[in-house]
C-alpha cells in the first residue's frame, strides 16, 4: 500500500484521468473530492461491497431460473 501525506487543498493523481483532493479535515473525518471520467465508477467501500453482493445474488437467481 502506498501511503501519502496531503494537506487540505492538495491533490493526488491516480493514473492520467483521476484526481483525489483533500477538501477538509474535521476530527477523525477527512472529506475528499474525486474527479474521474464517467466510465470510472467511484464508490465508498461499503457501497461497493453492497453492489457486489447484489450482483452475486442476482447471478445466483439467474442460475436458478435456468433450472
From Swiss-Prot:
GO terms for molecular function: mRNA 5'-UTR binding. Belongs to the CsrA/RsmA family. This is Translational regulator CsrA. GO terms for cellular component: cytosol. The keyword ATP-binding does not apply. It holds the Pfam family CsrA. Coiled coil: none annotated. Gene3D superfamilies: Translational regulator CsrA (2.60.40.4380). A key translational regulator that binds mRNA to regulate translation initiation and/or mRNA stability. Mediates global changes in gene expression, shifting from rapid growth to stress survival by linking envelope stress, the stringent response and the catabolite repression systems. Usually binds in the 5'-UTR; binding at or near the Shine-Dalgarno sequence prevents ribosome-binding, repressing translation, binding elsewhere in the 5'-UTR can activate translation and/or stabilize the mRNA. Its function is antagonized by small RNA(s). Signal peptide: none annotated. InterPro entries: CsrA, CsrA_sf. One of its GO terms (biological process) is mRNA catabolic process. Keywords: Activator, Cytoplasm, Repressor, RNA-binding, Translation regulation. The keyword Repressor applies. It is found in: Cytoplasm. Homodimer; the beta-strands of each monomer intercalate to form a hydrophobic core, while the alpha-helices form wings that extend away from the core.
